[in-house]
A protein has these predicted regions:
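Non-catalytic nucleic-acid substrate-recognition regions in nucleic-acid-modifying enzymes
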Residues: 1-48
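Class I S-adenosyl-L-methionine-dependent methyltransferase catalytic core
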Residues: 19-23, 28, 43, 47-52, ...
Length: 257
């Protein structure tokens, strides 16, 4: 753990992710920043264009906020394990944030699966936050699997990575949890994406235990909500907007069995 011992002020930037109208959000941000300056004795100074600290407030479903802090003045070491990445890789800081938000729904010693694991970041961050017993990562992209194995080794994680299509995957026992960064649509049509999500929910129902959990990061809110409407075997537990600009959401969904 590293910390600063300084006598001069730190400059910060505030970012708010909420459903507030823009004018109210701007007013709230100004008042919040001013109060931060006052309470810190001006050791924290609002400087949106030249800052050392980034504060991010994420509105929760109950109306409260989760607060995240990023120190840009300390060299990153927390995510040094991520030596390999591919184009679709999630940033490890984002993965860590998603797992932190989903933590109330996660359990220790679970058997977990990432069906589109890429270079393994979601599984690694999940196990760091809440240790699991058995961890499986699947990806159709061989280069990603090779990178995932190396990243897991650097992180000191024991994860079973398999180069396979999720829809062809079978296993001897059921899983407590499926956690994944869902593939982006790319060049797929709406009809193809709709069919993909239908297949995904059907396949996952065959791999999850009763009361098992889906933790999904996706910008296809409409297709996920459609599956929740037409399928009685799933129930939405939590939904959180993460990136408002391009509509990426975190979903926590229970499989009722």
């Amino acid at each position: 753990t590293q910390a600063h011992r300084e006598t001069t002020p730190f400059y910060f930037r505030l970012e708010i992710k909420s459903h507030m109208p823009l004018d109210k959000k701007s007013t709230f941000a100004r008042r919040f920043s001013a109060e931060m300056e006052r309470l810190s004795g001006r050791m924290l100074v609002n400087a949106p264009s030249d800052y050392e600290i980034e504060l991010r407030l994420l509105e929760k479903r109950d109306g409260g906020y989760a607060c995240f802090l990023k120190l840009l003045s300390i060299a990153p070491g927390r995510f040094a394990y991520r030596k390999n990445a591919v184009a679709a890789s999630i940033h490890p800081a984002t993965a860590a944030m998603l797992v932190a938000l989903a933590e109330p729904y996660l359990k220790e010693n679970a058997q977990i699966l990432d069906p589109f694991c890429g270079v393994g970041t979601m599984l690694i961050e999940r196990d760091i936050r809440v240790p699991a017993r058995e961890k499986y990562g699947i990806d159709i992209f061989g280069e990603a699997i090779r990178g995932a194995r190396e990243n897991a080794s650097y992180a000191g994680e024991k994860i079973n990575f398999i180069n396979r299509d999720y829809f062809d995957f079978t296993h001897a026992y059921l899983f407590d949890e499926i956690i994944t960064n869902m593939p982006v649509r790319g060049r797929k049509s709406k009809e193809e994406t709709d069919a993909f999500y239908s297949r995904f929910f059907e396949k996952s129902a065959g791999l999850l235990k009763a009361d098992g959990i889906l933790v999904l990061y996706s910008n296809e809110q409409g297709f996920i909500r459609k599956q929740l409407r037409i399928r009685s075997d799933y129930r939405l537990l939590a939904e959180q907007c993460i990136r408002e600009k391009d509509q990426f959401y975190l979903f926590v969904i229970q499989y009722k069995g």
